[in-house]
């Protein structure tokens, strides 16, 4: 199964920590967070990796190369201009397997990806989201699901929310089917959450995978140091 890791963002919120390297290369105990992601994937047999890069992407490409010394095979898609966090998917569609993993590049995790993928296949889903509670639901996409774990509503950060809601957020780890790229999306920059995933809410094609497994987002200095 192909793994796509999104590493093309500028990481503007992390400039106070590292302005000369991309966010996925920020070290955790001496090793880049992206290296730790790749190590976790490799240990579970996910070795076919495509990394989308943009801002300071040469730093990532120079460090990981073809992935051989990390036990994986890595190819790259370099965004010459910003495409949004999902725009590159349409450019590499022909390189994807029918189902593929799509991961943010700035998270620490220790999860069973094979079980996650099997859950997706069992539900014959177009999209499956790894969901969990976190410390900042106000700054995250909140997911509301039915009793079968099908996603009914996706509440983005800017959406009005009920007074009380379950702290269930999208962790930035997904199993997707290529069918999701058959949608017609307008605009030069494509937002994964708002333009590809959110429209699937309520259709019975997107499920959430609630799990207590370890996932830590490194998206801000506060979360990095926590």
Put a short name on every predicted segment.
Residues 1-61:
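N-terminal glycine-rich phosphate-binding loop and ensuing alpha1 helix
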Residues 2, 47-49, 73, 126, ...:
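Residues at the starts of beta-strands that form the adenosine-phosphate
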Residues 5, 51, 102, 127-130, ...:
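Structural beta-sheet core signal
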Residues 25, 143-145, 197, 208:
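A structural signal for short hydrophobic beta-strand segments in well-ordered beta-sheet cores
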Residues 35, 86, 193:
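Glycine-rich phosphate-binding loop at the start of an alpha helix
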Residues 36, 40, 59, 91, ...:
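Alpha-helical elements of Rossmann-like donor-binding domains used by nucleotide-donor carbohydrate transfer enzymes
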Residues 46, 100-101, 108, 114-121, ...:
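Catalytic-core segments of class I nucleotidyltransferases/pyrophosphorylases
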Residues 61-62, 66-147, 183:
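Conserved beta-loop-beta/alpha segment of the NTase-like Rossmann-fold superfamily
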């Amino acid at each position: 199964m192909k793994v796509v890791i999104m590493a093309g963002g500028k990481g503007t919120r992390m400039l106070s920590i590292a302005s000369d390297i991309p966010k996925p290369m920020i070290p955790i105990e001496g090793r880049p967070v992206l290296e730790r992601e790749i190590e976790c994937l490799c240990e579970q047999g996910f070795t076919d990796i495509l990394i989308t890069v943009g801002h300071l992407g040469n730093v990532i490409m120079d460090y990981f190369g073809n992935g051989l010394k990390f036990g994986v095979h890595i190819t790259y898609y370099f965004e010459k201009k910003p495409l949004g966090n999902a725009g590159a998917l349409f450019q590499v569609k022909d390189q994807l397997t029918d189902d593929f993993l799509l991961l943010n590049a700035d998270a620490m995790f220790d999860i069973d990806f094979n079980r996650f993928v099997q859950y997706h296949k069992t539900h014959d889903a177009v999209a499956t989201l790894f969901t969990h509670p976190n410390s900042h639901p106000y700054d995250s996409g909140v997911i509301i699901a039915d009793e079968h774990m099908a996603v009914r509503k996706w509440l983005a950060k800017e959406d009005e929310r009920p007074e009380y809601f379950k702290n269930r957020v999208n962790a930035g780890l997904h199993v997707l089917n290529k069918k999701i790229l058959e949608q017609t999306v307008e605009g030069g920059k494509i937002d994964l959450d708002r333009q590809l995933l959110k429209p699937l809410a309520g259709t019975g094609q997107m499920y959430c995978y609630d799990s207590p497994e370890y996932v830590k987002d490194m998206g801000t200095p506060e979360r990095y140091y926590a």
